Swiss-Prot record:
Subcellular location: Cell inner membrane
Name of the protein: Phosphate import ATP-binding protein PstB
Domain of life: Bacteria
Gene3D superfamilies in the cross-refs: P-loop containing nucleotide triphosphate hydrolases (3.40.50.300)
Species: Prochlorococcus marinus (strain SARG / CCMP1375 / SS120)
């Protein structure tokens, strides 16, 4: 990344964190999702919902360039973060992923101690402060400090599934991102662990912008401020596959209580999906 594009120097005073402008994402010659427009607000939770195959996870991964790891994946259009083109040739994808962190569907702690799960990433990113304080602060923000404080030197694998997922959230927090992406973070967890994660999300939005993919309609309603509903349609022509598209984006309560589109109403009422 060149000096003129240092992401930590980019601060936009408006209320938008990330803006997608006519985004089409393809794998090879096949479009996965087309013509997506919406703005992700700062310090809010935005949910991406829709049936399997509608492109919501593909869109989520595009927000921090995780799709770059798939050689056949290409993107057209613009994704702006604080007004900066994330796909500019002058932007370092590694720096993008530091500013826009990701929590995956399955808990994936490092094969290290609980302490090192937090400290390792901060250390390799040049953190020069008090690591003990950083570890405690990150674990507290992820609501897992009480479960971890007496066994910081034990393996991250010693924790339960829900605790491991909150450890992964703490690990992401420790890098000091601006945005946290979550790809179905509760799908592998029991109901009690899910409640803990949702409570954590409510607390995290005080300091972070959060984007979450979920198949759980009630979860989207509980945790998010804005919701984007995606659907999939037949591509037509010689291609018998489907392509995802954004149907509707609005305040979550409006999406669930008075959606503009019939497809949205049908999906949230369980008629398909």
């Amino acid at each position: 990344m060149t000096d003129s594009y240092q992401m930590e120097d980019i601060k936009n005073s408006n209320e938008t964190s990330i803006s997608l402008q006519n985004v089409t994402i393809s794998y090879g010659d096949s479009d996965a999702v087309r013509n997506v427009y919406f703005d992700i607000p700062k310090y809010k939770v935005t949910s991406l919902i829709g049936p399997s195959g509608c492109g919501k996870s593909t869109v989520l991964r595009s927000l921090n360039r995780m799709n770059d790891l798939i050689s056949s994946c290409t993107l057209k259009g613009l994704i702006l973060f604080e007004g900066l083109d994330l796909y500019s040739d002058q932007i370092d994808p590694v720096e993008v992923r530091r500013k826009i962190g990701m929590v995956f569907q399955q808990p994936n702690p490092f094969p290290k101690s609980i302490y090192e799960n937090i400290a390792f990433g901060a250390r390799i990113n040049g953190f020069s402060g008090n690591l003990d304080e950083l570890v405690e602060d990150s674990l507290r923000k992820a609501a897992v400090w009480d479960e971890c404080k007496d066994k910081l030197n034990e393996s991250g694998y010693s924790l339960s599934g829900g605790q491991q997922q909150r450890l992964c959230i703490a690990r992401t927090i420790a890098i000091k991102p601006d945005v946290i992406l979550m790809d179905e973070p509760c799908s592998a967890l029991d109901p009690i662990s899910t409640i803990k994660i949702e409570e954590t999300i409510h607390e995290l939005k005080k300091n972070f912008t959060i984007v979450i993919v979920t198949h759980n309609m009630q979860q989207a309603l509980r945790v998010s401020d804005k919701t984007a509903f995606f659907n999939a349609a037949e591509k037509g022509g010689t291609d018998d596959g489907k392509v995802g598209y954004l149907v509707e984006f609005d305040k979550t309560k409006k999406i669930f209580n008075s959606p503009k589109e019939k497809a949205t109403q049908d999906y949230i009422s369980g008629k398909f999906g």
